[in-house]
């Protein structure tokens, strides 16, 4: 939901309606159908789709589902993002479980029955096949995805910092997000956004 009066596209099916916690931010172009549950302090980005028309799709507290992501599941199955889960732009989750504090990279696909463990990461563009399990604090990558190595403390901390920025974006969006007309030219004193401190991982590694 938004404080600007703009509402996401929500649809019931067979009398089952989506649930959006009042502290969550769901972009007005996101689509939620049926048995879709968005928990406290979650962020759902532009163009995201949560289709709860077969199985249940669930976002637990503090998780984020970024632009153009898809969540869906077979009948009788759940698709779950646990607490502080982080789903990058364009990823597809189908009947899988992304566990606490885990990250799924941009344009990755995680298939039915797969599990991404606590504080684990799936690299961008990966394909996690059905039933595959990524252990806790492990990096998986490739098509199909394979176990690469254990994550470092620095990498896990980097992920957590990025997730906190999305949790702050929820607050920022509730406070100031609104539809507007664009300017026709740049102002001389155009301000920069106070958007947080996270940086790309390669930048962080170079700096430390």
Over which residues does each language-model region extend?
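Glycine-rich hexapeptide-repeat left-handed beta-helix
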Residues: 1-19, 53, 61, 67-69, ...
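A positional/architectural concept
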Residues: 19-73
